[in-house]
Amino acid sequence: MLYQSETLQLHWLENGIAELVFDAPGSVNKLDTKTVANLGEALNVLEKQSELKGLLLRSAKTALIVGADITEFLSLFNAPPEKLHQWLVFANTIFNRLEDLPVPTISAINGYALGGGCECILATDFRIASPEARIGLPETKLGIMPGFGGSVRLPRLLGADSALEIIATGKDVTANDALKIGLVDAVVDPEKLVGSALTMLKQAIDGKLDWQAARRPKLEPLKLNPTEAAMCFTIAKGRVMQVAGKHYPAPLTAVKTIEAAAKFGRTEALNLETNSFVPLAGSNEARALVGIFLNDQYVKAQAKKLSKGVAAPKLAAVLGAGIMGGGIAYQSALKSVPVIMKDINENSLDLGMNEAAKLLNKQLERGKVDGLKMASILATIRPTLDYAGIERAQVIVEAVVENPKVKAAVLAEVEALIGEDTVLASNTSTIPIDQLAKSLKRPENFCGMHFFNPVHRMPLVEIIRGAKTSDKTLAAVVAYATQMGKTPIVVNDCPGFFVNRVLFPYLAGFGMLVRDGGDFHQIDKVMEKQFGWPMGPAYLLDVVGIDTAHHAQAVMAAGFPERMNKDYRDAVDVMFDNQRFGQKNGQGFYRYTQDAKGKPRKENDEQVDKLLAEISQPLQEFSDEDIIARTMIPMINEVVRCLEEGIIASAAEGDMALVYGLGFPPFHGGVFRYLDTLGSANYVEMAQRYAHLGALYHVPAGLRAKAEHNESYYPVAAALLDVSTNQPA
């Protein structure tokens, strides 16, 4: 053994060939600050070996390196810029030393080589992968860009076009795709990976492979003539602006950095990369996007903890077909849980099966399933007009019309037919679970399971705990949601639960703004382009359905009359009274026609302005700041109330529910991250300017207390490790 640390080992293989093995404690290798330092120490030893002829780099795990340790990121980002710059120079010096070894080097890639793992293999002369390997640089998805030379070496290895695609999108590539673009030199069976890498290394040592020629382009300027460069980078910048937009600066910064570095060799190009990385790391967007990654890990860990030891059901049932029931049945069947789909109406069953077939057809067109697989998945959905076999289902999801009497009757009816351990869940969006539980003899076996539409796309499932819901019931439903590929978040019961409870104050703020003369076109534009929502409130109402929103609005007003009751007709009332229900009937705030692909195309409708004039002040232009404040303050206040009342258990779960359930702009990180970015005191001061508008704008006491004590919702990350001593700075 030449060198050994907690995360890697260096030893001789044979005849002057050394092997560097990444083998950290735990299930995966990460390129954390400690491992980077350990790599430097291993190179110290290696550089002194006069008999060294070659180096093979591999992993003892099922993946090479899954990336940097993202739990360290916020600490790094909170460091003074000069400290972060110093650490990046330190790290890049180590990767340069790996690249500059006076012998050929090769990486054997099994599983993932992402982020810093990808940058590490780029520093070797050759790369060989097993078929399941995936390689990529996902940093731009986290609001940053490669920082260990990825933006320098990848373009020089692959050419600018392929490198820009990988870096700007943050997507990883398969081993076979990596072979096609020149990212790896060979793909071999897993059992032959190390042997083949050793053979290739020996060929390089014997002069049969020119390892110096493989290394040379990575040290030199990018080989592009001025015309090619202008075309390549102009197209890339245009594409990035179109896809990422102004709220996600990292992809464009990466493209511009690669462009600026193209004419330089490695040293100057790395300096440019570091100089671009540091400001990105200090940005609010990076903190928010890294925060989302960490919150996602936390939420998934909570789900795993809740459902520990509980298997997903072998058979499920959905009561109520149609689009929603069909979507739930499809998702269940797709993820290998057979499902009974029951309805009282043959047409609804046909609609549900057609929905499942349509979604599977899309999978077929994309090559995700073949015809045989599609048929076998569809065969696991059993449509039925009666309850035959329902007693065999372990979890039953009620998804009938959003009417408390109908839901209660259906739940009571099915409960009489099933065993004492069968779990019942209601896919209600607003009706309190405790209200529905009154019709049941075994309320401990009952909870809410709120899917979002469209089911196959929306990652969130709200699991609603009623007053009598047992832990066993929650565990079973969380296990089912997880098996379905969803992110379950447990919330406590109240009208609207969490997501809809906080959505309707936002829509109420919109309604008041329109009442006071706001133009809904301008409001939508500001909330989409400036704040970053995928769709503005008027467009969202059309997509949700004006009739659905009108009904939910009444439920919320009854549940929270002190804030959500209103004594005036609003825009939703006007649309509803005029039977403008949104996309479902082709007219709402906007008019909808079908495009060539059969998707709804939004168009302006002058008739709407005339209808809204009945309930609005004369049109006036509000500032972007006013529009954002008047719509967002009610939502933010309600989100905070939900945490203070224990409806949600943590800021992390609240923020993930908003991002996954409502499409809250990820670059803000969720309401709690947004508040931490603004500063609680700044937010309270802003909200007070709108307090005259009513109770929805009154800041909750807990948030006022945080403002007074200068507290945040998320803990402040500790300082960056000092690069020379590995101790907190």
From Swiss-Prot:
Task: Write down the Pfam families for this protein, in alphabetical order.
Answer: 3HCDH (PF00725), 3HCDH_N (PF02737), ECH_1 (PF00378)
Q: Name one GO biological process term.
A: fatty acid beta-oxidation
What pathway is it annotated to? Lipid metabolism; fatty acid beta-oxidation
GO cellular component terms given for this protein = fatty acid beta-oxidation multienzyme complex
Which cysteines are cross-linked by disulfides? Answer: none
Show the GO MF annotations.
Answer: 3-hydroxybutyryl-CoA epimerase activity; delta(3)-delta(2)-enoyl-CoA isomerase activity; enoyl-CoA hydratase activity; long-chain-3-hydroxyacyl-CoA dehydrogenase activity; NAD+ binding
As its record notes, the protein acts as a catalyst of: a (3S)-3-hydroxyacyl-CoA + NAD(+) = a 3-oxoacyl-CoA + NADH + H(+); a (3S)-3-hydroxyacyl-CoA = a (2E)-enoyl-CoA + H2O; a 4-saturated-(3S)-3-hydroxyacyl-CoA = a (3E)-enoyl-CoA + H2O; (3S)-3-hydroxybutanoyl-CoA = (3R)-3-hydroxybutanoyl-CoA
Q: What is its EC number?
A: 4.2.1.17, 5.1.2.3, 5.3.3.8, 1.1.1.35
PROSITE patterns the UniProt entry points to: 3HCDH, ENOYL_COA_HYDRATASE
Keyword Metal-binding assigned: no
Site (Important for catalytic activity) at E119, E139
UniProt-annotated stretches for the region Enoyl-CoA hydratase/isomerase: 1-189
For the ligand (substrate), the binding residues are D296, N500, Y660
Give the active-site positions: H450 (for 3-hydroxyacyl-coa dehydrogenase activity)
What Gene3D superfamilies does this protein map onto?
1.10.1040.50, 2-enoyl-CoA Hydratase, Chain A, domain 1 (3.90.226.10), NAD(P)-binding Rossmann-like Domain (3.40.50.720)
Q: Which UniProt keywords apply?
A: Fatty acid metabolism, Isomerase, Lipid degradation, Lipid metabolism, Lyase, Multifunctional enzyme, NAD, Oxidoreductase
Q: Where is this region: 3-hydroxyacyl-CoA dehydrogenase?
A: 311-729
Amino acids binding NAD(+): M324, D343, V400, V401, E402, K407, S429, N453
What this protein is reported to do is described as:
Involved in the aerobic and anaerobic degradation of long-chain fatty acids via beta-oxidation cycle. Catalyzes the formation of 3-oxoacyl-CoA from enoyl-CoA via L-3-hydroxyacyl-CoA. It can also use D-3-hydroxyacyl-CoA and cis-3-enoyl-CoA as substrate.
Family membership noted in the UniProt record? In the N-terminal section; belongs to the enoyl-CoA hydratase/isomerase family. In the C-terminal section; belongs to the 3-hydroxyacyl-CoA dehydrogenase family.
Q: Which HAMAP family match?
A: FadB
Subunit architecture: Heterotetramer of two alpha chains (FadB) and two beta chains (FadA).
Name by which UniProt lists this protein? Fatty acid oxidation complex subunit alpha
